[in-house]
Amino acid sequence: MAAKQERWRELAEVKRELAERDWFPATSGNLSIKVTDEPLTFLVTASGKDKRKETVEDFLLVDQNGEPAESGHSLKPSAETLLHTHLYNKTNAGCCLHVHTVNNNVISELYGDQKKITFKGQEIIKALGLWEENAEVTVPIIENPAHIPTLAALFAEEISEDSGAVLIRNHGITAWGKTAFEAKRVLEAYEFLFSYHLKLKTLEHQLVK
């Protein structure tokens, strides 16, 4: 119980920070944080909640299959909880953050046909643990089928590391790390890269004119 309460506080703090950036439009997005390893349990955002609000029903505990691990409530886990279960079952990740922003949606559409986007030489890449000069990082972009098990299977094919990110085309980004702090850092780094890239392309287009 103590572990659950501590993880709840951690996830609530992350949710608060991301909500202040308006990264949860129209109740979109979902977050989770691991509570126990054996058996695997994690807290995940409840379906349909306004994540800009803070209530005692923001999260619920689920098991390794994404099913509620506790009774006595009518909460349903986020529709995309299956993606989180794949992540925790395949890696040592401890926290997973999924947000919909204009920038990550535009990037995913611009480069969706290439199925990836690569960034190189940006200082912020160091936040992803890559310290060599002119380091580069690639984000895979997967399609966005309406059938969640199909989407989850596509997502599972792209995860192997304990921290990372995947873009879902015209949908959003899922970022993760070993801790809530690391997951948020990864998410922030990629959102910075997306914003920088789009602004640079706009300026280049204006200069060409």
Swiss-Prot record:
Any one GO CC term of the record: cytoplasm
A Pfam family recorded for this sequence: Aldolase_II
EC code(s) of this entry: 4.2.1.109
Known pathway: Amino-acid biosynthesis; L-methionine biosynthesis via salvage pathway; L-methionine from S-methyl-5-thio-alpha-D-ribose 1-phosphate: step 2/6
Residues holding Zn(2+): 98, 100
Cofactor: record remark: Binds 1 zinc ion per subunit.
Temperature-related behavior of activity: Optimum temperature is 40 degrees Celsius. It loses most of its activity at 55 degrees Celsius.
Keyword field: Amino-acid biosynthesis, Lyase, Metal-binding, Methionine biosynthesis, Zinc
Single GO biological process annotation from the record: L-methionine salvage from methylthioadenosine
Catalyses which reaction(s): 5-(methylsulfanyl)-D-ribulose 1-phosphate = 5-methylsulfanyl-2,3-dioxopentyl phosphate + H2O
pH-activity dependence text: Optimum pH is 7.5-8.5.
Listed GO MF terms: methylthioribulose 1-phosphate dehydratase activity; zinc ion binding
Cofactor(s) demanded: Zn(2+)
Subunit structure: Homotetramer.
Family under the similarity heading: Belongs to the aldolase class II family. MtnB subfamily.
Matches recorded under NCBIfam families: PRK06754.1, salvage_mtnB
Function as written in the Swiss-Prot or TrEMBL entry: Catalyzes the dehydration of methylthioribulose-1-phosphate (MTRu-1-P) into 2,3-diketo-5-methylthiopentyl-1-phosphate (DK-MTP-1-P).
Name this protein carries in UniProt: Methylthioribulose-1-phosphate dehydratase
Organism the protein comes from: Bacillus subtilis (strain 168)
Gene: mtnB
